[in-house]
A protein has these predicted regions:
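Secreted peptidase-domain scaffold signal
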Residues: 277, 281, 287, 326, ...
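Autoinhibitory propeptides
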Residues: 78-146, 153-167, 339, 453-455, ...
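Hydrolase catalytic cores
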Residues: 227-231, 235, 423-454, 513-581, ...
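C-terminal subdomain of the subtilisin-like protease fold in secreted/lumenal serine endopeptidases
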Residues: 83, 450-474, 508-514, 553-629, ...
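Extracellular/luminal Protease-associated
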Residues: 145, 274-276, 294-298, 375-462
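Subtilisin-like serine protease catalytic core
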Residues: 38, 106, 135-275, 289-292, ...
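Inhibitory N-terminal propeptides of secreted protease zymogens
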Residues: 36-122, 409-410, 436, 640-641
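Catalytic-core environment of secreted peptidases
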Residues: 198-209, 393-396, 418, 498-542
Length: 711
């Protein structure tokens, strides 16, 4: 027995040292070839991925992987690394000189070396695109599922993340812990917030904003907003002062949350971001902890960088990985261009509305409003005519704190001018002075924002605001009423800023679209409020992450690729004239995704074979197709329904190519699989094209597979 163990150790040592010898040789050559200036350059943090699998798809133990890393570090003369990865990735982050970087890149034992970079979060301030308000009303779903949120942390004191009754069954495989930190004890986690971790070595603790917390506590607000949309508790009251905006539930309110803080606040908010070394470490930890869904709303770098390779390791561990496409349309293509990530673009919708009706006149103006309660008839006053003694007229018009005379404002609706201070700060000033409502008017422009205000509020564009002000200047003793407006038939469209897929990419991106403008979410107390609207593909990705949790809870035997297929193939096309590379499969549909009929499954190891080039794209069983002019693409579908079903196929939407499906029809028993081919016949001249292959079941089930044909 001892001899067998010794033999295994000798074999392991030989396996480790054989490729490492190349590192030492490479170091000697690089030192000789690099110019003196480069040899003397300071060390920088780099991410190093070793060539051996070292992922959750490998049977190598963590001990073996660490031994390999030790040998590479030693031979390259690298000091103690900042991070080491053994679950989603086999690699490390370390300070490297240019000499060490080039030597490692030349070594057979190393597959990738890249510098640590800071990525931005994929959201925008609400006023850049807040056009819809969504307060989900579902009270159940996601029981037993843990969603890992890689982001800026979480606000644990918010009632959306409280340990409440009714969370349902306990998670089966999660083993994460509660990492202590500033103002965060090791016992701060519970049945809802099941684990937290934080990683700052890549970003640098010395670069943090003074208000930042060396813990999982969120000060930016982004991570809290995302987590609240994904899995916030059910039926939590949304309010700011006496003004109610209804009740809030996350998409999967019974799901548990694990927060992995890898995004940090800098002194200048423009420098906020997420270092790639911290991101990879967070992904590695989440994979080791055993989350069921992983949500990452970070703008991507290169197509298959270290972050994407770590996400591959997560996918190989049967984790549904959901990523934000990014908000840089016209400047860059969609992030997370990997087939193992469900990449989400954003939908824009109508602004939620309210009406201010002036009594005794025909003046009735509609603007942005999130208020769900009416004020009743009340005096309406101009803020500039209601100022305190000593306050400047400009300050009073903007409803700055202390500028409003309570004797003139109490019980009234106050007309405030936009600018100078925050919009919500204005309604707070009105409330403190005794006002019961606010009309916010633009100085210029028509952009209107539906914020969560402390009094019922309607936000008017400049033209309507000027009409109201002119009327009140002529009629001083006037009453008005604020009330919500019911909207009907307003359709969503692809957000203009949502990043499109690369027409020359390997896979179709984004995969799906979801609501991404003016999405209501919780924010940490440090921001000065409890609720705020946010916009961006991060909001959309949060929605899809919640849907993934619902599917995993409902269908506990479904693999991650099955969930990914169900989300994409049941989506509905958005009829707004945008291309497949803007919307992928289209708008996600919750009810349809729960009953997809047919799914496309990816076999274990196929993603990695595809990445290595040994499996062609036409054979990777993804729920979308990126074709090259004339070609034949093979896909396999499986019936996950409870009865035998007949399906017929169509190929539609193609302008320049002839596309057919063979066979044209399938009959499948429950659990049965079948292969079909998509045959693309080229056009006379090379031209891009797109369309859809659709399978329709006898009971109305629709399975849509988007197809993009590149030139």
């Amino acid at each position: 027995m001892q001899g067998a163990r010794d033999g295994r150790r000798r074999a392991l040592r030989a396996a480790v040292l054989a490729p490492v010898a190349g590192v030492l040789t490479g170091l000697i050559l690089v030192v000789a070839l690099l110019p003196a200036q480069a040899r003397d350059a300071p060390a920088r943090l780099h991410l190093v991925t070793l060539s051996t699998p070292g992922t959750s798809g490998s049977d190598r133990s963590a001990e073996e992987l660490l031994s390999m890393q030790d040998a590479v570090l030693s031979e390259a003369g690298v000091a103690a690394p900042a991070y080491r990865w053994t679950t989603a990735l086999n690699g490390f982050a370390a300070e490297l000189t240019p000499v060490q970087v080039e030597a490692l890149r030349a070594a057979d034992s190393v597959s990738l070396v890249e510098p640590n970079e800071v990525h931005e979060l994929s959201s925008t301030p609400a006023d850049l695109g807040a056009r819809t308000a969504r307060v989900p009303e579902r009270a159940r779903g996601g029981a037993g599922i843990v969603v890992g949120i890689v982001d800026s942390g979480i606000a644990p004191d918010n009632p959306l993340f409280a340990d409440v009754p009714g969370l349902g069954r306990e998670p089966e495989r999660f083993s994460g812990a509660c990492m202590p930190g500033d103002d965060w004890a090791a016992d701060s986690c519970h049945r809802k917030l099941v684990g937290v971790s934080w990683f700052v070595s890549g970003f640098g603790a010395e670069r943090l904003r003074a208000a930042e917390s060396l813990s999982a506590r969120d000060v930016i607000g982004h991570g809290t907003q995302v987590a609240s949309v994904v899995a916030g508790n059910a039926e939590v009251s949304v309010s700011a002062g006496p003004s109610a905006a209804g009740r809030f539930s996350g998409v999967a309110p019974q799901a548990r949350v694990a927060a992995y803080k890898a995004c940090w606040a800098a002194p200048d908010p423009a420098d906020d971001g997420c270092a790639s070394a911290d991101l990879v470490t967070a992904i590695d930890r989440a994979t080791s902890d055993g989350v069921d869904v992983l949500s990452i709303s970070v703008a991507g770098g290169r197509a298959f960088d270290t972050v994407q390779r770590a996400l591959l390791g997560a996918a190989e561990a049967d984790i549904v990985v959901v990523g934000a496409a990014g908000n840089r349309a016209g400047r860059s293509y969609a992030a997370h261009a990997s087939p193992w990530v469900t990449t989400v673009g954003a939908l824009a919708g109508p602004v939620p509305q309210g009406r201010v009706a002036v009594r005794g006149s025909a003046l009735s103006l509609v603007g942005a409003s999130r208020s769900t309660v009416a004020t009743g008839s009340a005096p309406i006053v101009l803020a500039g005519r209601s100022r305190t003694a000593g306050s400047a007229l400009a300050q009073a018009r903007q409803c700055r704190e202390g500028s409003l005379d309570a004797s003139l404002v109490a019980g009234a609706i106050v007309v405030c001018q936009r600018g100078g201070i925050g919009r919500i700060d204005k309604s707070n000033a009105v409330r403190r002075a005794g006002g019961i409502g606010m009309v916010l008017t633009n100085v210029r422009g028509s952009a209107r924002i539906a914020d969560v205000h402390s009094v019922p509020t309607v936000h008017l564009g400049a033209r309507d605001g000027a009409r109201l002000v002119r009327h009140l200047r002529r009629h001083s003793a006037t009453k008005a009423r604020i009330a919500p407006v019911q909207q009907r038939g307003a359709g969503a469209r692809t957000a203009r800023w949502s990043s499109p897929g690369d027409p020359d990419g390997a896979v179709v991106k984004p995969d799906v679209l979801a609501a991404g403008t003016g999405v209501l979410g919780a924010v940490p107390p440090v921001t000065g409020r409890r609720w705020n609207a946010f916009s961006g593909t991060s909001a959309a990705a949060a929605h899809v992450s919640g849907l993934a949790a619902l599917l995993r809870a409902r269908h506990r035997d479904w693999s991650a690729p099955t969930v990914r297929s169900a989300l994409t193939t049941t989506s509905a096309a958005v009829r707004d004239g945008t291309s497949t590379l803007r919307q992928g499969s289209g708008r996600v549909r919750r009810a349809a995704a729960l009953r997809p009929g047919l799914v496309l499954r990816v076999a274990s190891g196929d993603y990695r074979r595809w990445l290595s080039g040994t499996l062609p794209s036409r054979s990777l069983n993804t729920p979308s197709i990126m074709a090259r002019d004339s070609t034949v693409v093979t896909r396999e579908v499986t019936n996950v329904g409870t009865r035998s079903m007949y399906y017929s196929s169509t190929a539609s939407g193609f302008d320049h190519h002839r596309v057919r499906v063979e066979p044209a029809a399938l009959r499948l028993r429950p659990g049965q699989s079948a292969t079909f081919r998509v045959v693309v016949a080229g056009s006379d001249t090379p031209r891009g094209d797109s369309g859809t292959v659709t399978w329709r079941g006898a009971q109305g089930t629709t399975v849509r597979i988007p197809v993009v044909i590149s030139r």
